[in-house]
Amino acid sequence: PALTYQVSGLKNGDTAGAVLNGGSLSRVAGENVGVYGINQGGLGLVSANYDLNYQGNNLTITKALLNVIADAKTKVYGDADPSLTYQVSGLKNGDTAGAVLNGGGLVRVSGENVGNYAIQQGGLGLVSGNYDLAYQGNNLTITKALLNVIADAKTKVYGDADPSLTYQVSGLKNGDSAGSILTGGLNRAAGENVGVYGINQGDLALNSGNYDLAYQGNNLTITKALLNVIADAKTKVY
Protein backbone atom coordinates (compact mmCIF):
# COMPACT_ATOMS: atom_id res chain seq x y z
CA PRO A 1 0.00 0.00 0.00
CA ALA A 2 0.99 3.66 -0.12
CA LEU A 3 3.25 4.46 2.84
CA THR A 4 1.59 7.38 4.58
CA TYR A 5 2.37 9.34 7.73
CA GLN A 6 0.96 11.76 10.26
CA VAL A 7 2.55 15.12 11.02
CA SER A 8 2.37 17.09 14.25
CA GLY A 9 4.17 20.14 15.57
CA LEU A 10 3.48 22.56 12.73
CA LYS A 11 3.62 26.23 13.78
CA ASN A 12 2.55 29.62 12.48
CA GLY A 13 0.07 28.18 10.02
CA ASP A 14 2.71 26.11 8.21
CA THR A 15 1.54 23.09 6.26
CA ALA A 16 3.26 19.74 5.87
CA GLY A 17 3.41 20.32 2.14
CA ALA A 18 5.28 23.56 2.68
CA VAL A 19 7.91 22.33 5.13
CA LEU A 20 8.48 18.74 3.89
CA ASN A 21 10.18 17.95 0.61
CA GLY A 22 7.50 15.53 -0.60
CA GLY A 23 9.90 12.59 -0.50
CA SER A 24 8.47 9.16 0.09
CA LEU A 25 8.87 6.73 2.93
CA SER A 26 10.42 3.38 2.12
CA ARG A 27 10.26 -0.03 3.68
CA VAL A 28 12.55 -2.98 4.14
CA ALA A 29 12.48 -5.13 1.01
CA GLY A 30 10.61 -8.44 0.95
CA GLU A 31 7.34 -9.96 -0.22
CA ASN A 32 6.98 -13.01 1.96
CA VAL A 33 4.74 -13.07 5.01
CA GLY A 34 6.38 -11.15 7.83
CA VAL A 35 7.00 -7.71 9.40
CA TYR A 36 8.96 -5.09 7.46
CA GLY A 37 10.17 -1.79 8.95
CA ILE A 38 8.93 1.44 7.36
CA ASN A 39 11.87 3.82 7.04
CA GLN A 40 12.16 7.58 6.50
CA GLY A 41 13.36 7.03 2.95
CA GLY A 42 13.62 10.27 1.00
CA LEU A 43 11.34 12.27 3.26
CA GLY A 44 13.05 15.45 4.53
CA LEU A 45 12.64 19.10 5.38
CA VAL A 46 12.78 22.11 3.10
CA SER A 47 12.31 24.51 6.00
CA ALA A 48 15.13 25.55 8.30
CA ASN A 49 12.61 26.31 11.04
CA TYR A 50 12.20 22.68 12.09
CA ASP A 51 14.16 19.65 13.12
CA LEU A 52 12.53 16.49 11.83
CA ASN A 53 11.90 13.67 14.27
CA TYR A 54 10.91 10.55 12.36
CA GLN A 55 9.26 7.59 14.09
CA GLY A 56 8.98 4.46 12.00
CA ASN A 57 6.39 1.72 11.95
CA ASN A 58 5.87 -1.61 10.24
CA LEU A 59 4.31 -3.00 7.13
CA THR A 60 2.96 -6.44 8.00
CA ILE A 61 2.40 -8.92 5.20
CA THR A 62 -0.23 -11.47 6.19
CA LYS A 63 -1.02 -14.78 4.58
CA ALA A 64 -3.14 -14.89 1.43
CA LEU A 65 -6.00 -17.36 1.21
CA LEU A 66 -5.41 -20.17 -1.27
CA ASN A 67 -8.64 -21.85 -2.31
CA VAL A 68 -8.57 -25.49 -3.37
CA ILE A 69 -11.86 -26.87 -4.69
CA ALA A 70 -12.12 -30.57 -5.47
CA ASP A 71 -13.65 -31.48 -8.82
CA ALA A 72 -16.82 -33.59 -8.77
CA LYS A 73 -16.20 -37.05 -10.19
CA THR A 74 -18.30 -39.97 -11.40
CA LYS A 75 -17.65 -43.57 -12.26
CA VAL A 76 -19.72 -46.59 -13.17
CA TYR A 77 -20.01 -49.36 -10.59
CA GLY A 78 -17.11 -51.76 -11.00
CA ASP A 79 -14.84 -49.35 -12.86
CA ALA A 80 -11.56 -47.97 -11.54
CA ASP A 81 -11.61 -44.64 -9.71
CA PRO A 82 -10.87 -41.56 -11.81
CA SER A 83 -8.05 -39.27 -10.77
CA LEU A 84 -9.13 -36.92 -8.00
CA THR A 85 -8.33 -33.44 -9.28
CA TYR A 86 -8.91 -29.93 -8.01
CA GLN A 87 -8.97 -26.27 -8.97
CA VAL A 88 -6.77 -23.66 -7.30
CA SER A 89 -7.47 -19.95 -6.97
CA GLY A 90 -5.85 -17.15 -5.01
CA LEU A 91 -2.26 -17.57 -6.18
CA LYS A 92 -0.19 -14.39 -5.90
CA ASN A 93 3.09 -12.96 -7.17
CA GLY A 94 3.41 -15.44 -10.01
CA ASP A 95 3.31 -18.43 -7.67
CA THR A 96 2.20 -21.75 -9.14
CA ALA A 97 0.17 -24.48 -7.49
CA GLY A 98 3.09 -26.84 -7.94
CA ALA A 99 5.37 -24.50 -6.05
CA VAL A 100 3.14 -23.80 -3.05
CA LEU A 101 1.36 -27.16 -2.63
CA ASN A 102 3.11 -30.30 -1.45
CA GLY A 103 1.81 -32.55 -4.22
CA GLY A 104 -0.16 -34.71 -1.80
CA GLY A 105 -3.26 -36.36 -3.18
CA LEU A 106 -6.91 -36.06 -2.36
CA VAL A 107 -8.69 -39.13 -1.00
CA ARG A 108 -12.29 -40.25 -0.95
CA VAL A 109 -14.45 -42.10 1.52
CA SER A 110 -14.13 -45.83 0.89
CA GLY A 111 -16.88 -47.86 -0.74
CA GLU A 112 -17.70 -49.42 -4.11
CA ASN A 113 -21.49 -49.63 -4.10
CA VAL A 114 -23.64 -47.13 -5.94
CA GLY A 115 -23.81 -43.85 -4.03
CA ASN A 116 -22.00 -40.60 -3.21
CA TYR A 117 -18.59 -40.62 -1.57
CA ALA A 118 -17.00 -37.46 -0.16
CA ILE A 119 -13.70 -36.35 -1.64
CA GLN A 120 -11.46 -35.21 1.20
CA GLN A 121 -8.25 -33.18 1.46
CA GLY A 122 -6.13 -36.23 2.18
CA GLY A 123 -2.40 -35.46 2.12
CA LEU A 124 -2.70 -32.21 0.17
CA GLY A 125 -1.05 -29.35 2.01
CA LEU A 126 1.09 -26.23 1.71
CA VAL A 127 4.85 -25.91 1.49
CA SER A 128 4.66 -22.11 1.47
CA GLY A 129 4.23 -19.98 4.57
CA ASN A 130 2.63 -17.23 2.51
CA TYR A 131 -0.81 -18.84 2.31
CA ASP A 132 -3.58 -20.30 4.37
CA LEU A 133 -5.27 -23.20 2.58
CA ALA A 134 -9.06 -23.31 2.35
CA TYR A 135 -10.19 -26.71 1.08
CA GLN A 136 -13.67 -27.28 -0.35
CA GLY A 137 -14.62 -30.90 -0.93
CA ASN A 138 -16.86 -32.52 -3.47
CA ASN A 139 -18.24 -35.99 -4.24
CA LEU A 140 -17.34 -39.04 -6.24
CA THR A 141 -20.62 -40.49 -7.47
CA ILE A 142 -20.78 -44.18 -8.36
CA THR A 143 -23.56 -44.83 -10.85
CA LYS A 144 -25.27 -48.09 -11.75
CA ALA A 145 -23.69 -50.50 -14.23
CA LEU A 146 -25.81 -51.94 -17.03
CA LEU A 147 -26.57 -55.65 -16.70
CA ASN A 148 -27.63 -57.25 -19.98
CA VAL A 149 -29.91 -60.30 -19.89
CA ILE A 150 -30.59 -61.98 -23.24
CA ALA A 151 -33.12 -64.82 -23.38
CA ASP A 152 -32.04 -67.98 -25.21
CA ALA A 153 -34.14 -69.06 -28.19
CA LYS A 154 -36.04 -72.30 -27.48
CA THR A 155 -37.94 -74.91 -29.45
CA LYS A 156 -40.23 -77.77 -28.60
CA VAL A 157 -42.38 -80.21 -30.48
CA TYR A 158 -46.15 -79.76 -30.28
CA GLY A 159 -47.43 -81.61 -27.25
CA ASP A 160 -44.11 -81.78 -25.42
CA ALA A 161 -43.37 -80.04 -22.13
CA ASP A 162 -41.77 -76.61 -22.28
CA PRO A 163 -37.99 -76.53 -22.04
CA SER A 164 -36.38 -74.46 -19.30
CA LEU A 165 -36.30 -70.80 -20.24
CA THR A 166 -32.67 -69.81 -19.87
CA TYR A 167 -30.70 -66.65 -20.54
CA GLN A 168 -27.24 -65.20 -20.93
CA VAL A 169 -25.90 -62.46 -18.67
CA SER A 170 -23.21 -59.88 -19.45
CA GLY A 171 -21.96 -56.79 -17.64
CA LEU A 172 -21.26 -58.30 -14.24
CA LYS A 173 -18.71 -56.32 -12.18
CA ASN A 174 -16.61 -56.71 -9.05
CA GLY A 175 -16.83 -60.51 -9.07
CA ASP A 176 -20.63 -60.48 -8.82
CA SER A 177 -22.47 -63.57 -10.05
CA ALA A 178 -25.83 -63.73 -11.78
CA GLY A 179 -27.14 -65.93 -8.98
CA SER A 180 -26.28 -63.36 -6.36
CA ILE A 181 -27.95 -60.38 -8.01
CA LEU A 182 -30.90 -61.83 -9.97
CA THR A 183 -34.12 -63.37 -8.70
CA GLY A 184 -37.14 -64.88 -10.42
CA GLY A 185 -37.45 -66.36 -13.87
CA LEU A 186 -38.60 -65.79 -17.44
CA ASN A 187 -42.01 -66.71 -18.80
CA ARG A 188 -43.49 -66.98 -22.26
CA ALA A 189 -46.65 -66.03 -24.06
CA ALA A 190 -49.40 -68.60 -23.53
CA GLY A 191 -50.27 -71.12 -26.20
CA GLU A 192 -49.63 -74.74 -27.18
CA ASN A 193 -50.36 -74.75 -30.89
CA VAL A 194 -47.62 -74.68 -33.47
CA GLY A 195 -46.22 -71.15 -33.69
CA VAL A 196 -43.81 -68.64 -32.21
CA TYR A 197 -44.27 -67.41 -28.64
CA GLY A 198 -42.37 -64.50 -27.13
CA ILE A 199 -40.16 -65.19 -24.14
CA ASN A 200 -40.75 -62.38 -21.64
CA GLN A 201 -38.84 -61.09 -18.63
CA GLY A 202 -41.45 -62.52 -16.29
CA ASP A 203 -40.52 -61.89 -12.69
CA LEU A 204 -36.79 -61.86 -13.34
CA ALA A 205 -35.48 -58.88 -11.39
CA LEU A 206 -32.48 -57.42 -9.62
CA ASN A 207 -31.86 -57.62 -5.92
CA SER A 208 -28.79 -55.39 -6.20
CA GLY A 209 -28.87 -51.61 -6.31
CA ASN A 210 -25.63 -51.54 -8.28
CA TYR A 211 -27.17 -52.38 -11.67
CA ASP A 212 -29.83 -51.39 -14.13
CA LEU A 213 -31.28 -54.41 -15.95
CA ALA A 214 -31.61 -54.38 -19.74
CA TYR A 215 -33.69 -57.36 -20.90
CA GLN A 216 -33.70 -58.66 -24.47
CA GLY A 217 -36.33 -61.28 -25.26
CA ASN A 218 -36.39 -64.19 -27.66
CA ASN A 219 -38.87 -66.82 -28.86
CA LEU A 220 -40.08 -70.29 -28.02
CA THR A 221 -40.99 -71.98 -31.29
CA ILE A 222 -43.45 -74.90 -31.22
CA THR A 223 -42.87 -77.16 -34.18
CA LYS A 224 -45.19 -79.75 -35.66
CA ALA A 225 -45.37 -83.20 -34.15
CA LEU A 226 -44.96 -86.18 -36.46
CA LEU A 227 -48.18 -88.11 -36.94
CA ASN A 228 -47.49 -91.67 -38.08
CA VAL A 229 -50.15 -93.44 -40.16
CA ILE A 230 -49.54 -97.20 -40.69
CA ALA A 231 -51.87 -99.11 -42.95
CA ASP A 232 -53.20 -102.39 -41.61
CA ALA A 233 -52.35 -105.53 -43.60
CA LYS A 234 -55.43 -107.17 -45.17
CA THR A 235 -56.24 -110.52 -46.90
CA LYS A 236 -59.07 -111.85 -49.09
CA VAL A 237 -59.99 -115.15 -50.82
CA TYR A 238 -59.64 -115.27 -54.62
Predicted features and spans:
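Solvent-exposed beta-strand/loop surfaces, strongest in extracytoplasmic domains of secreted
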Residues: 1-238
